């Protein structure tokens, strides 16, 4: 199949996914794969999860969309679940980039300041404001002039603390940089950034689009670092595949976000809200403890089976968000293609990094089977490179 009628903005693999069940996907040729992508960190609860499917199916028999001209009980219920007992309010969007745009607008409007500090190798989205806060020149190429007032610092570098001054409106960061190479923030550094923001009156925005909804073994990744953001954004896993995003901010910020200050026609539609209302209560302490335990097994397996392979430079990440950094002799896309042949779907990130984002409900047998396949393919490719030298 060759796609003839769609802009070629994606470099696609030459097969289509036609079905999914649990943590496995099936393509248009009938081949089944173990999924270490979760739709790029979206389907954290896998495919055809009975509770989510039932919630969505039931909502489809009622209302799908009404716009935001009327009160919406589903939105308020999901917002309450996101607030999780804290004094926070929620703005719903359709995606992560929209949620980050809302955070940018709110930060500037509330503080009356324009300066934003972001970080190199970050990714916050592809719409103009979010792209301008993304520390990747490749993403920004050809789109100048970008949104002004945004500066960048080095991630995990104490020198960044000196750039947090009262003149800023906000600092935006990911606690684990996903697209940039799966680099986890150092706890002491993240806490120092949080403290400096509080001391200077600068808003701290944490982008949880990829790290949230249990990905690191916590409801939101920042909780595992003891952070207290003024605003956080979430999207990918929130509705397990339906388009939704959310900006969650302190209640006092509402003074700058009244009627007409921001909006979206589709945001918070009933079907996506039904899915999110089903997803969030499943993030129980028991499940999150299990995710952390399973992640520990995965990291142990990586340390013994994958890390010793000569082409592996380092392994980074947090929880079930993993980056295997490869020697330039082994292009990551070659690894991904070989793994597809073996029946495992994986992702890339950063310069030459194999990224793993399995569903958080995947059981140890499948997780370890996937790691074994990665070790097999990397060992084979190492042998091939050595033979050809």
Curated annotation (Swiss-Prot):
The keyword Cytoplasm applies. Pathway: Amino-acid biosynthesis; L-arginine biosynthesis; N(2)-acetyl-L-ornithine from L-glutamate: step 4/4. It catalyses: N(2)-acetyl-L-ornithine + 2-oxoglutarate = N-acetyl-L-glutamate 5-semialdehyde + L-glutamate. Its cofactor is pyridoxal 5'-phosphate. N(2)-acetyl-L-ornithine binds at residues 126, 264. One of its GO terms (cellular component) is cytoplasm. The modification N6-(pyridoxal phosphate)lysine is found at residue 236. Pfam families: Aminotran_3. Its EC number is 2.6.1.11. It is found in: Cytoplasm. CDD domains: OAT_like. GO terms for biological process: L-arginine biosynthetic process. GO terms for molecular function: identical protein binding; N2-acetyl-L-ornithine:2-oxoglutarate 5-aminotransferase activity; pyridoxal phosphate binding. Binds 1 pyridoxal phosphate per subunit. Belongs to the class-III pyridoxal-phosphate-dependent aminotransferase family. ArgD subfamily. HAMAP family: ArgD_aminotrans_3 (MF_01107). PANTHER family: ACETYLORNITHINE AMINOTRANSFERASE, MITOCHONDRIAL, AMINOTRANSFERASE CLASS III. This is Acetylornithine aminotransferase. It comes from Lactiplantibacillus plantarum (strain ATCC BAA-793 / NCIMB 8826 / WCFS1) (Lactobacillus plantarum). The lineage of its organism: Bacteria, Bacillati, Bacillota, Bacilli, Lactobacillales. The gene is argD.
């Amino acid at each position: 199949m060759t796609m003839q009628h769609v802009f070629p903005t994606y470099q696609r693999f030459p097969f289509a996914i036609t079905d999914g069940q649990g943590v496995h996907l099936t393509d248009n040729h009938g081949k089944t794969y173990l999924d270490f992508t979760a739709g790029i960190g979206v389907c954290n609860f896998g495919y055809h999860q009975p509770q989510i499917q039932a919630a969505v199916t039931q909502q489809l028999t009622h209302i799908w969309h009404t716009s935001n001209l009327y009160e919406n009980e589903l939105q308020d219920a999901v917002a309450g679940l996101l607030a999780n007992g804290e004094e926070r309010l929620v703005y719903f969007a359709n995606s992560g980039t929209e949620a980050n745009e809302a955070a940018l607008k709110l930060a500037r409007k509330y503080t009356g300041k324009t300066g934003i500090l972001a970080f190199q190798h970050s990714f916050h989205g592809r719409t103009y404001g979010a792209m301008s806060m993304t520390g990747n020149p490749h993403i920004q190429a050809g789109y100048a002039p970008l949104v002004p007032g945004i500066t960048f610092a080095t991630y995990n570098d104490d020198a960044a603390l000196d750039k947090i001054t009262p003149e800023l409106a906000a600092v935006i960061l990911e606690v684990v940089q996903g697209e940039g190479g799966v680099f986890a923030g150092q706890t002491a550094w993240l806490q120092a950034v949080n403290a400096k923001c509080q001391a200077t009156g600068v808003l701290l925005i944490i982008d949880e689009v990829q790290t949230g909804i249990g990905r690191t073994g916590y409801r939101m990744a920042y909780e595992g670092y003891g952070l207290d953001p003024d605003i956080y954004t979430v999207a990918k896993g929130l509705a397990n595949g339906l388009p939704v995003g959310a900006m969650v901010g302190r209640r006092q910020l509402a003074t700058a976000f009244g009627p007409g200050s921001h909006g979206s026609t589709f945001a918070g539609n009933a079907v996506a809200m039904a899915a999110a209302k089903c997803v969030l209560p499943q993030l129980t302490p028991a499940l999150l403890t299990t995710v952390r335990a399973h992640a520990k097994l995965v990291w142990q397996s990586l340390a013994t089976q994958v890390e010793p392979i000569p082409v592996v430079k380092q392994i980074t990440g947090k929880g079930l968000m993993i980056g295997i950094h490869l020697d330039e002799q082994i292009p990551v896309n070659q690894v991904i293609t070989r793994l597809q042949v073996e029946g495992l779907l994986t992702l890339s990130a950063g310069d030459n990094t194999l990224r793993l984002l399995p569903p958080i409900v995947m059981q140890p047998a499948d997780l370890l089977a996937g790691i074994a396949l990665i070790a097999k393919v990397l060992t084979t490719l190492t042998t091939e490179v050595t033979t050809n030298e």
